[in-house]
From Swiss-Prot:
Tissue: Expressed by the venom gland.
Alphabetical list of InterPro entries matching this protein: Omega-atracotox, Omega-atracotox_CS
A Gene Ontology cellular-component term: extracellular region
SS bond list: C52-C66, C59-C70, C65-C84
Note: This toxin comes from a female specimen. It is observed that propeptide sequences coming from female specimen have only limited homology with the male paralogs, but the reason is unknown. Negative results: does not inhibit potassium channel currents. Has no activity in vertebrate smooth and skeletal nerve-muscle preparations.
Extent of the signal sequence: 1-22
Domain of life: Eukaryota
This protein's record includes keyword RNA-binding: no
Membership in a protein family: Belongs to the neurotoxin 08 (Shiva) family. 01 (omega toxin) subfamily.
Presence of the UniProt keyword Secreted in the record: yes
Designated name of the protein: Omega-hexatoxin-Ar1a
Residue ranges annotated as propeptide in the record: 23-48
Biological role stated in the UniProt entry: Insecticidal toxin that reversibly and voltage-independently blocks both mid-low- (M-LVA) and high-voltage-activated (HVA) calcium channels (Cav) in cockroach DUM neurons. Also causes a modest block of insect sodium channel currents (Nav). Induces potent excitatory symptoms, followed by flaccid paralysis leading to death in house crickets.
């Protein structure tokens, strides 16, 4: 195997691994990311579980915080942003 063939093999391998990894981060219908998707045994539908945003993380839509509330706080740049309590 010469250098060009080895490079092409590595490129294909990286592409395949990237595609597999991208499937784990399927966007849900509310703009967030589902932690995992599983096939429901009744009806064969895919059910995505929602994930709450931990304390101190940005909450741009004022929803999905684990604590249930989101307030404006100053970030490291001095800008005011919404963060989960």
């Amino acid at each position: 195997m010469n250098t060009a063939t080895g490079f092409i093999v590595l490129l294909v391998l990286a592409t395949v691994l990237g595609a597999i990894e991208a499937e784990d981060a399927v966007p849900d219908f509310e703009g967030g990311f589902a932690s995992h998707a599983r096939e429901d045994t009744v009806g064969g539908k895919i059910r995505r579980s929602s994930v709450c945003i931990p304390s101190g993380q940005p909450c741009p839509y004022n929803e999905h915080c684990c604590s249930g509330s989101c307030t404006y706080k100053e970030n490291e740049n001095g800008n005011t942003v919404q963060r989960c309590d």
